[in-house]
Amino acid sequence: MTILRKSHPLMKMVNHAFIDLPAPSNISGWWNFGSLLGLCLIIQIASGLFLDMHYTSDTLTAFSSVAHICRDVNYGWLIRYIHANGASLFFVCLYLHIGRGIYYGSYSYKETWNIGIILLFLTMATAFMGYVLPWGQMSFWGATVITNLLSAIPYIGTDLVEWIWGGFSVDKATLNRFFAFHFILPFIIAAMAMVHLLFLHETGSNNPLGIPSNCDKIPFHPYYTTKDFLGIVLLLTFFFTMVPFFPDLLGDPDNYSPANPLNTPPHIKPEWYFLFAYAILRSIPNKLGGVIALILSILILALLPHIQTASQRSLMFRPISQFLFWLLVSDVLVLTWIGGQPVEPPFIIIGQIASLSYFTIILVLMPIAGINENKMLKW
C-alpha cells in the first residue's frame, strides 16, 4: 500500500497533501478551521443538490416549492434546515479562520491570503443569491435593496442594475439567473480552495510563534488527521444539535411570508453574517460612499500584508497589538448588532462610531502599535 501511495499519480498527490505533508509540530486548534470549512462546503453542496431536485426557480412557484420540500419530501425539512444553517456554520468557521490568520500573521503568505479573500467574496456572493431563492419577503426586498446599490456607480449604474435584474425590477429573470449562479459557484469555490491549498503547501503552514519551523516538522498523518477528526466530530455534534431543535434561530421570520412587491417590510436586513458590512454601508449618508465603504470593509484584508510594521509576525508576544485585535473583534460584534437594528437614534451614531473605529484600528492603530513594539523590543 505504501508503494502505491507514493507511486500512483493520483494517490501521490493526496499523499503529498494530506499524509506525508511536513507540518509544524506546535499548531493549535485554531488551525482546524481549514478542514472544517472543507466539511461545510461538502455539506452545502450535498444538501443543495437534493434541494435542487425539488426546487423550481419561478416567481409563482418558488415559495410553494420550498414549502413542498418541507412538508411532502421525505426528510425534506431536515435537508432544508441543514442547508440553511450550514451557511451560518460556514461563515462562523470562515470568520474564525480569518481571525486566526490576522492574529498569527498568516497574511504574510500573500498568494494564499489573496486567494482566501477571493474565496470570501465568492462565498458571500453565493450566500446572498441563496438567500433570494426561497422568494419570501426578506428574499425579495433584500435582493432589491442590495442589487440596487450598484446604481450608485456613476454613468453605468442604472444600466448595470437593469442588466442584472433582467428587467426593470427583481422578477422571474432575476430569480432564474440567481439560481443558476447559486448552483455553479460552490463548485468554483471548491476549485479555488484547491488553489488555496496549493499555494499554502508551497510555503508550508504558519505556526503560533510565527517563526520558521523547518527544523521541527512532523507528518500530517496521523497527528493532524486525528486532530482534524476531533474538530469535525465536535462541529457535527453542535450542528446536529442545533438543526433539529433550533432550526430558525438565525433566520428571519419575514421570510416565511411570500414575496410581495406591494408591501415593504418595516426593516430590511440581510442574514446575520453580512450585518457588520451592512452596518458600515448604512453609516455613511451618501449612497456611493456607502457602497465604497462596504467593499473596502472586505478589501481592507488585502492591505494587511502591506501595512505590517512589526518585526514579529504573530501577536503572541505583542500585548498592544493583542489589545487592538480584541478591540477589533468587539467592534465587528457591535457592527453586527447595529446592522440588525432599525435606522434611528441612538443606533445611527453608534454605527458611525463603530464603522470609523473599524477602519482606524486596522489602518492607523495597528501599524503604529507595530512600530512602538519594535522600539520596546529594540528590534
Curated annotation (Swiss-Prot):
InterPro entries: Cyt_b/b6_C, Cyt_b/b6_C_sf, Cyt_b/b6_N, Cytb/b6-like_sf, Cytochrome_b, Cytochrome_b_C_euk/bac, Cytochrome_b_N_euk/bac, Di-haem_cyt_TM. One of its GO terms (molecular function) is metal ion binding. It comes from the Eukaryota. Heme b b566 binds at residues 97, 196. It is found in: Mitochondrion inner membrane. A ubiquinone binds at residue 201. Keywords: Electron transport, Heme, Iron, Membrane, Metal-binding, Mitochondrion, Mitochondrion inner membrane, Respiratory chain, Transmembrane, Transmembrane helix, Transport, Ubiquinone. GO terms for biological process: mitochondrial electron transport, ubiquinol to cytochrome c. The keyword Iron applies. Its cofactor is heme b. The keyword Cytoplasm does not apply. Heme b b562 binds at residues 83, 182. Its main location: mitochondrion. The chain crosses the membrane at residues 33-53, 77-98, 113-133, 178-198, 226-246, 288-308, 320-340, 347-367. Binds 2 heme b groups non-covalently. The cytochrome bc1 complex contains 11 subunits: 3 respiratory subunits (MT-CYB, CYC1 and UQCRFS1), 2 core proteins (UQCRC1 and UQCRC2) and 6 low-molecular weight proteins (UQCRH/QCR6, UQCRB/QCR7, UQCRQ/QCR8, UQCR10/QCR9, UQCR11/QCR10 and a cleavage product of UQCRFS1). This cytochrome bc1 complex then forms a dimer. Component of the ubiquinol-cytochrome c reductase complex (complex III or cytochrome b-c1 complex) that is part of the mitochondrial respiratory chain. The b-c1 complex mediates electron transfer from ubiquinol to cytochrome c. Contributes to the generation of a proton gradient across the mitochondrial membrane that is then used for ATP synthesis. Heme 1 (or BL or b562) is low-potential and absorbs at about 562 nm, and heme 2 (or BH or b566) is high-potential and absorbs at about 566 nm. This is Cytochrome b. It comes from Dipodomys nelsoni (Nelson's kangaroo rat).
